[in-house]
Regions:
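Feature primarily recognizes SF3-like P-loop helicase cores of small DNA viruses
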Residues: 42-67, 121, 148-152, 158-193, ...
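N-terminal nucleic-acid engagement/recognition segments and initiation subdomains in replication
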Residues: 1-86, 98, 102
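Alpha-helical protein-protein interaction elements
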Residues: 14-15, 32, 37, 83, ...
Length: 320
């Protein structure tokens, strides 16, 4: 029993991490587990007060808390081979330029920071843009390392269960959400990305509590002009074009090999994180590049086009 009951800081639930003599198909504590534990304490210690036993289990779990993502990241050993710069090209055919490198590096460091420092300020969404079947969603899923740490179930931000759908996940994909959004919902997405915590009550607790964010959000779109014509700026959205025909290998061609590559990429990112030589935002020069680059992913401004067309054809000496 010693060391078997632990609180999972990612899911905020109690896990049983060792075999305890009965059949289990999930690490998370269930009602059946509680019944077995009550029976165990009654037979071995003569304890029959259910509430006190359940309270004791919660205290023991909290004293033995752990974070599976942090444990995974801390255990990584980098082999010294650079992968962050080449990963998106290898699996999705993206460019290997400084922008693509900085975009992925920023996203990785944001995810690492959210694991070790929940609620830290990070409002960037890496957006993979390209045709269907390129492997964009699979990339985010494998990037999460454990499929249980990934979710693509966040379809609507006005869903009353949106915060519960975030719970227990590290990488969350928001597929086509920006491309199908109107002006009002774009502002809602921006506000959503900027939050550092949520306050809500989970079903088995009595009081609401602040839940600091431990996740980051990735976007994917099959539509090229998915960004809105937004005069207030789209700095949160970092688009990277994918060209599957240029990829070295499809990410699912050998999933085990892809996972090993991605694990080493996380190890490389951890070296940067441990050094402390990073910021969770672009440099001013890269921000300028981003603003220009984002125009390639916006629909044409028809009014601006009409004005430019008029000016090109205008032969007078005064415009107004």
């Amino acid at each position: 029993m010693k060391g078997a009951i632990r609180k999972n800081l990612l899911t905020e639930r109690i896990d049983i991490v060792k075999p305890l003599g009965w059949y289990r198909d999930s690490p998370t504590l269930t009602d059946v587990d509680v019944k077995y534990l009550l029976l165990y304490f009654e037979e071995n210690y003569g304890l029959t007060v259910e509430k006190k036993i359940i309270d004791a289990v919660a205290v023991i779990a909290n004293e033995n808390r752990y974070h599976p993502v942090c444990d995974f990241l801390n255990a990584l050993q980098w082999d010294g081979t650079e992968r962050i710069r080449f990963c998106l090209h290898r699996f999705l055919g993206s460019d290997t330029d400084d922008y693509t490198y900085e975009a992925l590096k920023l996203f990785l460091l944001g995810a690492i920071s959210r694991a070790f420092k929940p609620g830290c300020k990070f409002e960037v969404m890496l957006c993979l843009v390209g045709g269907q079947g390129a492997g964009k969603s699979s990339f985010f899923r494998l990037l999460a390392v454990n499929d249980d740490w990934f979710s693509d179930d966040l379809k609507k931000l006005d869903d009353e269960n949106v915060y519960r759908k975030m719970q227990g996940h590290w990488i969350i994909e928001m597929s086509e959400m920006i491309a199908t959004a109107n002006a009002k919902s774009i502002e809602e997405i921006k506000s959503f990305l900027s939050r550092q915590k949520e306050t809500y009550k989970i079903p088995y607790e009595t009081h609401p509590a602040d839940r600091k964010r431990q996740c980051v959000f990735g976007g994917s779109s099959n539509t090229l002009d998915f960004l809105p014509l937004d005069r207030t700026g789209n700095r949160r959205f970092v688009p990277v074009m994918v060209y599957p025909e240029r990829a070295e290998v499809h990410i699912l061609a050998d999933e085990q090999a892809s996972r090993e590559y991605i694990n080493q990429m996380w190890a490389e990112a951890m070296e940067i994180y441990r050094s402390g030589n990073f910021r969770l935002r672009f440099s001013p020069a890269m921000n300028d590049y981003l603003k220009a680059h984002q125009k390639d992913f916006m629909p044409e401004d028809t009014k601006a086009g009409q004005i430019l067309d008029y000016l090109e054809r205008y032969s007078g000496s005064m415009v107004c």
